[in-house]
From Swiss-Prot:
Annotated source species: Triticum dicoccoides
InterPro entries membership: NAC-dom, NAC_dom_sf
Gene Ontology cellular component list: nucleus
Gene3D superfamilies attached to this UniProt entry: NAC domain
Name used for this protein in its record: NAC transcription factor NAM-B1
SUPFAM superfamilies in the cross-refs: NAC domain
Length: 405
């Protein structure tokens, strides 16, 4: 008796230990613990053989990883939260009902739309490597697209369903997957059941064109943002480089500062001919007398002016006007008549009271302002501007022609 009691007690302890240390079955809606890096991404054959067929035969599944949901009672965007596992695609066991009691067409209507089949059914064949081996047909795969609204004017969406169902050798639904016969008041409901279980994979297709446009827009926005961010640094670097190395390229802020001192720099150049006050005017007059050319004077570059408007190469102050019969080269500027540099020198000798006004007034009224300003400043013209101004001629007044008959 003692030995039997001890053996029965040890058996009870072993049973209790087994139940205590046995892992609990996974609950519905809870994701199973998969090792890092593992994903549930079976092939079509694996889905049919190891999951759908065993589900139809009521055999134990390898893992409780596919939820049982009637897909046609929900919209596709509501299904991901009902899945057991999945990130970009979700798997479900779902029943199928008939659309009509005496027909074989399935009911594809959902809550706010319907599923529409696309393409033809794809047979799922057993894998085999033997030469001339006839591969067994295991099931059928059908692709469907979800449309919002009512047929036939539904709005197509990007939600896709792959539906897997079993077939026998003749291509019809297997007997194990057919609903059992029922009696009583539930006969009408049972007559609409087409399949007990089908296996469905749901995912949302990504529009590659829209994704590409979005990526390009993002890159464009990033480029603009980078350019705006880098602009202050470029402006600061340009100002520093221009001051340290005498570069011809300056930042916009520096150009603004130089433009504000343009007239000051125009009349305050030293050494070469334009110093402040009466000294600069005297130098200009002396240079005018010494030059044999009537209207061309060349100024050397000056580095002490706030605006370096003289190029290293000699530049003419004013362009030479062409002579035509009856054309008077004299121009009245203010109270002075300037036809040559001698007139300018005389104005300077008289005290220079009107010389500055004459020079200031002469610039804006001179024809070809754009060309002459670049000549005075010593800035090289771009090819397009040079070509446009190369054929410029001064206005010609021909005597004896009545322009207003």
């Amino acid at each position: 008796m003692g030995s039997s009691d001890s053996s029965s007690g040890s058996a009870q302890k072993a049973t209790r230990y087994h139940h205590q240390h046995q892992p609990p079955p996974p609950q519905r809606g809870s994701a199973p613990e998969l090792p890092p890096g593992f994903r549930f991404h079976p092939t079509d054959e694996e889905l049919v053989v190891h999951y759908l067929k065993k589900k139809a035969d009521k055999a134990p599944l390898p893992v409780n990883i596919i939820a049982e949901v009637d897909l046609y009672k929900f919209d596709p965007w509501e299904l991901p939260e009902k899945a057991t596992i999945g990130e970009q695609e979700w798997y479900f066991f779902s029943p199928r009902d008939r659309k009509y009691p005496n027909g074989a067409r399935p009911n594809r209507a959902a809550t706010s739309g319907y599923w529409k089949a696309t393409g033809t059914d794809k047979p799922i064949l057993a894998s085999g490597t033997g030469c001339g081996l006839v591969r067994e047909k295991l099931g059928v795969k059908k692709a469907l697209v979800f449309y919002r609204g009512k047929p036939p004017k539904g709005l197509k969406t990007n939600w896709i369903m792959h539906e897997y169902r079993l077939t026998d050798a003749s291509g019809s639904t297997t007997a194990t997957n057919r609903p059992p016969p029922v009696t009583g008041g539930s006969r009408a409901a049972a007559s609409l059941r087409l399949d007990d279980w089908v296996l469905c994979r749901i995912y949302k297709k990504i529009n590659k064109a829209a994704a590409g446009d979005q990526q390009r827009n993002t890159e464009c926005e990033d480029s603009v943002e980078d350019a705006v961010t880098a602009y202050p640094l470029y402006a600061t670097a340009g100002m520093t480089g221009a001051g340290a190395h005498g570069s011809n390229y300056a930042s916009p802020s520096l150009l603004h500062h130089q433009d504000s001192h343009f007239l000051d720099g125009l009349f305050t150049a030293d050494d070469a001919g334009l110093s402040a006050g009466a000294t600069s005017l005297s130098h200009l007059a002396a240079a005018a007398r010494a030059s044999p050319a009537p209207t061309k004077q060349f100024l050397a570059p000056s580095s002490s002016t706030p605006f370096n408007w003289l190029d290293a190469s000699p530049v003419g102050i004013l362009p030479q006007a062409r002579n035509f019969p009856g054309f008077n080269r004299s121009r009245n500027v203010g109270n002075m008549s300037l036809s040559s540099t001698a007139d300018m020198a005389g104005a300077v000798d008289n005290g220079g009271g009107n010389a500055v006004n004459a020079m200031s007034t002469y610039l804006p009224v001179q024809d070809g302002t754009y060309h002459q300003q670049h000549v005075i400043l010593g800035a090289p013209l771009v090819p397009e501007a040079a070509a446009a101004t190369s054929g410029f001629q001064h206005p010609v007044q021909i005597s004896g022609v009545n322009w207003n008959p």
